[in-house]
Amino acid sequence: VGSVFQNPRTQFFNTDSDSEIAFGLENQGMPTEELRQRVETTAADLEIQSLRNRSLHALSGGEKQKVAFASVYAMNPDIYLLDEPSSNLDIDAIQDLRKHLKLVKQQGKTILIAEHRLYYLMDVVDRIVYMEQGQIAGIYTPEQFRAIEKDERKRMGLRAVNLHEVHPQFTSPGAAENKILKLQDVGLYYKKQAIVEHINLSAGIGEIIGVVGHNGAGKTTLSRTLCGLHKEAS
């Protein structure tokens, strides 16, 4: 059984990506040459060559999630247990995850996924188990699940099964007065390497700002900088 947790940091035993992928294989006593080949194959199958030999501390949340999945995939378990594997992933990385789940399914593996995002799984899963108040309240095929009316799905606390059904309502932005936060030409760094440069941003009292972007774009580093947890800024 291989497990991927919601927070990948809680399952890491090493400080670099290759060592983390190899860790389980080492504990199985796999010969060195076979181990190296398995790590190479894993990186190729999951298309994560760009994450090879990287410090785990330098990776974004989504990149860490990819390494966590790779460390399990390398061990070739019969059963995969995934706890919200898409929680740290951007939309492109979620599509990569979907592709990897299909690959594992084609290999004849059993997969159990606890998840809030539903849309990317609808052509992957065979059964959907709905839980309510600690009990199984329903078991559906994907076709039956898609047929649930929107209002009923909302009552069940479920998200959309098709992103084309999602139509967010936006309000016209006003000129926020009384600025409480201002960034001017700020740069963010990790071990003296630039992550983001020339950030100019201001926020007014009562204003809500969403910081979005691909995995590794610097969203978390910016947030950590604003609350004083990341010191490499200029």
Regions found by a protein language model. Give the residues of each.
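Conserved beta-strand-loop-alpha-helix hinge in the C-terminal portion
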Residues: 135-157
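Catalytic Walker B motif of ABC-type/P-loop ATPase nucleotide-binding domains
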Residues: 80-83
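Conserved ABC ATPase "signature" region
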Residues: 33-51
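Hydrophobic anchor residue at the start of the ABC signature
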Residues: 69
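H-loop/switch region of ABC-family ATPase nucleotide-binding domains
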Residues: 115-116
